[in-house]
Amino acid sequence: MCPGNWLWASMTFMARFSRSSSRSPVRTRGNLEEMPTVQHPFLNVFELERLLYTGKTACNHADEVWPGLYLGDQDMANNRRELRRLGITHVLNASHSRWRGTPEAYEGLGIRYLGVEAHDSPAFDMSIHFQTAADFIHRALSQPGGKILVHCAVGVSRSATLVLAYLMLYHHLTLVEAIKKVKDHRGIIPNRGFLRQLLALDRRLRQGLEA
């Protein structure tokens, strides 16, 4: 299971969702689990939150959510033995700071590192990092034997948002498809601001395909 922060995050999410639901009724257009692959025209952040809270909610310190792509927490990023055992070649830290994460931490392991200074706040613009992070993940998985750990503190919001953006940008999944794919393997809860930014990316990508 995830560290104790996961329980706190789940409780926070449920409280936030309950309050928002009481204020703003959610428009429903059928079961989200049965939503077609084409982006649903009425999809909104509240419906995404409902989807995120269905299905798998448990997680380990790291879970393989796509071939060679592990989504995890800070504990896994600090565990050199586990990184070596999994064959991790790249690390993307979505909670990089002066006190958390440096390339030097992986000296001797041959691991390439990218740090993204992101705050888990709805007001933070994570979208400015979507392409850079997706490119780094793509390069990691394109090399022979490449495996990447994408992590933040708990591995459910910042890092999950970047993984979803990668699946949308490089594998042309809709946001709903990307969420379902990740949730097959790990529970995630991107904050509401990140969900809005992913929705904007989804609309832009869908419009590009239709042009």
UniProtKB/Swiss-Prot annotation:
Residues 60-207 form the Tyrosine-protein phosphatase domain. One of its GO terms (biological process) is negative regulation of transcription by RNA polymerase II. It catalyses: O-phospho-L-tyrosyl-[protein] + H2O = L-tyrosyl-[protein] + phosphate; O-phospho-L-seryl-[protein] + H2O = L-seryl-[protein] + phosphate; O-phospho-L-threonyl-[protein] + H2O = L-threonyl-[protein] + phosphate. GO terms for molecular function: MAP kinase phosphatase activity; p53 binding; protein serine/threonine phosphatase activity; protein tyrosine phosphatase activity; protein tyrosine/serine/threonine phosphatase activity; RNA polymerase II-specific DNA-binding transcription factor binding. Keywords: Cytoplasm, Golgi apparatus, Hydrolase, Nucleus, Protein phosphatase. Its EC number is 3.1.3.16, 3.1.3.48. GO terms for cellular component: Golgi apparatus; nucleoplasm. The keyword RNA-binding does not apply. The keyword Calcium does not apply. It is found in: Cytoplasm; Nucleus; Golgi apparatus. CDD domains: DUSP26 (cd14578). It holds the Pfam family DSPc. The active site is at 152 (phosphocysteine intermediate). Belongs to the protein-tyrosine phosphatase family. Non-receptor class dual specificity subfamily. Inactivates MAPK1 and MAPK3 which leads to dephosphorylation of heat shock factor protein 4 and a reduction in its DNA-binding activity. Interacts with HSF4. This is Dual specificity protein phosphatase 26. It comes from Pongo abelii. The lineage of its organism: Eukaryota, Metazoa, Chordata, Craniata, Vertebrata.
